[in-house]
Amino acid sequence: MTKKKAATNYAERQNLASEDSSGDSVHFKDFIPLQELLKDKNYVPSVENLEKILYNETMFNDQKICSNLLLEALIITLFTTISGKSALRLIQTSSLKERKSWAQSFENNSSSYASIVLSWKDNDILLLKFLRFLLANKTAPLQINRYNLPEYKLPLSFLIVSKITIPSILLNETYNLLKDYLYSITGRIESLISCSSTFDKPALVVRKILKDYNRMIECRNFYFWYSFNAENRVNLTFSDNISLLMENDEGNAGSGLDDSRFDHQKQPREAIMGRTINDQEQIYSFELNQDGTLEIPNVMEHSLLRHELLFKILNLTTVLTPLLELQFSTLCGLVDPLMQPTPNDKHIISIDFLFQLFLGLMSQSIKTSQEHNDHYDWKFYMCFNMQKIIDATMLRLNCFDFDILNSVNNTDNAVHWKTQLHRWLPHGLNTQDLELLYMIDILAVYTIYKLYEKIPIQLNPFLFSLISLWKNLSCVILLALEIDRIEEENGTYETPLMVRATIRGAAALRSVIATVLNGLVKNNDHDFKHESLNTFMSPYGRKLCHGALYADLRSHTASLLALGASIEDVTDLFADLQSGDRFDEDIRYMFDYECEDYDESFSESDHGGLDESVVNPTEKIASGSNNVFFRRRCNCIFNDDKLVAEDGANEAFGSTNSENVEGAMHNNRNAVHNATTATSDHVVTSPNPLSVRSRSTFEFDYSGEDWRDVPRDFNMYYSPSYSFIHEPKLDVIFSLTLRGATEKLNKEESILLVRSVASCVRNEQDQMILADLESNFSASINGDVEGEGNTKMSKIDNEDLRRTTPDDIYEIWSEESAFERMLNVNHDVAWRLMDEMLMCTGYRRILIWFLTHLELKHSLIYYVFELIMGLRGKPFSGEASDQDKKDDMIYEILKKKQKNEDASGLPFSRQGPIVLSDIETKMLLQEFFMNAAIFLSSKNNEEENEDGEKISLYSLGLVRLICYMVQTLIANDKFFFTKSECTFELQTLLMTWIGILPEAKDLFFKIKTRLAMEEEDSADTMQHEGRKNSDIEKKLNAKPASELNLKLLNLFPSKPANKDDSSPINTLRSFIADYSFDTQVNPPGRRVVFYDGKILPLPKADKPIPLHEYITLAELDVGDSE
């Protein structure tokens, strides 16, 4: 009996739905817009005015107005609001089976509920009230499943006509009032809007209503414009008709709204897919057609198919909005190396150039979208779609959740790093697609910046997302670097290819984001305008962009809070965010094999027939790391570009035989050879090469930094009282060095060993001077007049002087590990030997690297300290004034002994203390602190104290000694925080020990305080200079900057009464009040000394060959072979 009642109720619902549509055709036929009916009330079609009309129930009494109001309210509410689309989604998903099961669920009290359903029959007033309810909640989706709760059903109590049944229905939590009402009116809604073709009367009316209310965009295929959620699209039986209707509108009104289903390229793509599936061999083979023509696969079409598949793989179809697919396909086409434009003499396919192309290709679609929406902010909407693409790619690249990324631990010995790869590496992508996605994100981030470049980055609407993305990418890079370090330490070198590809792409994208957040895009215009995107992807292709954050993040934090972000979200965002990292150096080391690929050498023949006027002047700029020249397509000059010596300056240390020089450069690109490696007939060559590692003609860069690898000041002069050995023997040096590594040497043996090494270095320096003099002498006289006797005597002397070289000594130290072993037995002798070797031209940086990578010992710390303090060598007496130096020299000449004897009894062969350049000092400290941190970390893992904690007592002593050393350097002004590049390494070293050693804690926070103070001082100085030298443009920009500060202050949460001013918000409020948005960041590293926007022509080797020329050359080659 109950089943029969349920069936009866279901039948009543069906009858009600079918009867609801009886007069709908009449409604459409006699439709009159409300704008005409309410002309006397000056009604203007808009959502706000429509909502006011619905609240005026006196309008419902007029049948003519009521019927037309119902149509307009139904179209606008259901198809252009979020709440209405929630109702439509339920209608679309409610199948016949679901409705039947819903009716059967109310077997009890069925008569009362049936009466409710009957009360809804032909009740337009209730339907209008329901549409009013939806319109009042137009910006929020309906949580339909919760409308069984009384608090949710109460606003819908107007649907219950009988006042007696209201309490029982509202309190019945098993009954969903909203769902029952929607099921009841489903049939009527479907019949009301249905149309058999796009040109039926109902369809035309729908289109007119949407256009009058300017809601065509919101209705378009039921998309959610500003939503990151994967909303399910509503596909009712009439949705395709409405979509087609808008596509066929006059003037192609919807052509710019991007519906891929009606794209003109759809047919070719389907043809490609069908051909690929049915005949896969066509991809790999070429077959003639029946007419004899050759059909070759279309690379462009296959790339289009690849981009379409990526769009689906990224799951962007679930968040599809107008222009989204068009933007994605345009980005793919521009960044894909197979489809992007080819470079020419006027353009470089740079990031900035691709951005301009992107805007040009999207301009027509943007204009069309603006025609349909008066309030359309195309910049924000373009960037909003870009953010959707970035989020989708990061999700696919497994770089979306920071908590998951931060929980991965590759250094855990109990878990192998390979078992953790699935947690942070992408799945189902090859390296080409991975790099393509990162390229897409790079152009997307740059677009977000460029469209809002007129305002400070702190006010960019997508600032929060950019910082979050940078944070995730930094975590991914750290994980990848850990794996590469582990493999290098184990000697296996099996870093997976996907890990290398991930770090390559992530580092490139991170550098763009960091440049944007640091406000350095204009400073780094060279990278964005003069380097191609493919070059930019390499760590060596990016000449200026850093991946680290150097900006004052307090301004970003204050702006986020002022613009509405919650304090909890901002706190989570900036937690675990480490600015000023040095990942870029590790990445360059990881990809060192790419260095020569992006610093390619060139020869004079590369210029071809070009005039000297069109040859790039910077082609004569030497690479900082190689003795080659590389070609740039711009006139930009960097501060570390080496100044090339002119004319005779090169010849002083060069060769008159150009062929020998070119051969030497080819054989050893990393070593810059001295003149004696390739001399003319006037200077005799020898099979033993000199130890020179850097050419002395490239001495200073454009910022004035001294890059010479030579002894300095008085170290160039020999001590008058020092007794050199004319012919030092290699076997004596070899035997004494090996003996000193195992047993204690007596004083005579120690002095003999030191004198032999000093003599080798001195002989090489003399030979270099002789070569210089010989070259100058040969250039000034006629070579025919030279006497053979002088030449032969020079040959004999040179052969004697070159029997033993510093190369031989360094080889013994390195291969036999003799030096490191000697430190355990004869450390005084070993360090004096190091002093003498540091006088060798070209070996100083090599020796600095060598000694900083030795095992950390107390004597090593002492030696580094003495080097920096100027206590090594032979310090002058007194205050080291000019008079003191003269007195010491006169005393030594007259007395034949040094005035200040060394405590070790091992005299120094040169004059004065050992002097290091700023570059050498920075290198010494940076390498020392970094390797000390690595050594101490490994030492702690090997030893445990009595409590079982991994703390080495030996390490405690070393760290305490390092702290004392740094404190002394600071006190003597030998450690400059702003100029030093080793601060990060020192902080990393101290970080582990601040909770163990009080000295480490005091030093760590002292460094942090001094850094903050000096940054503030430098900022104040920059602001003072900026105010002093400000031009008219800066004066004009001063007013908007102050207005921005005032606006942000007004947007801050109001100050609570009776509260102190110590809260973070009040601190940030005070900070932002005086903050200047023109503040510039000064990151370390390379800088542009001269920037020129001119693009130079392509090198001849890089120019594409025309097809007819290629065929001609091919025919000539075939003819020659025959």
Curated annotation (Swiss-Prot):
Composition bias, Polar residues: 11-24
GO cellular component: CCR4-NOT core complex; cytosol; nucleus
Main location: cytoplasm
Modified residues (Phosphoserine): S1042
An individual GO BP term: positive regulation of transcription elongation by RNA polymerase II
UniProt-annotated location(s): Cytoplasm; Nucleus
Keywords, in A-Z order: Activator, Cytoplasm, Nucleus, Phosphoprotein, Repressor, Transcription, Transcription regulation
Region called Disordered, residue ranges: 1-24
Assembly notes: Subunit of the 1.0 MDa CCR4-NOT core complex that contains CCR4, CAF1, NOT1, NOT2, NOT3, NOT4, NOT5, CAF40 and CAF130. In the complex interacts with NOT1. The core complex probably is part of a less characterized 1.9 MDa CCR4-NOT complex.
Function: Acts as a component of the CCR4-NOT core complex, which in the nucleus seems to be a general transcription factor, and in the cytoplasm the major mRNA deadenylase involved in mRNA turnover.
Miscellaneous section: Present with 1320 molecules/cell in log phase SD medium.
Protein name in the entry: Protein CAF130
Lineage: Eukaryota, Fungi, Dikarya, Ascomycota, Saccharomycotina
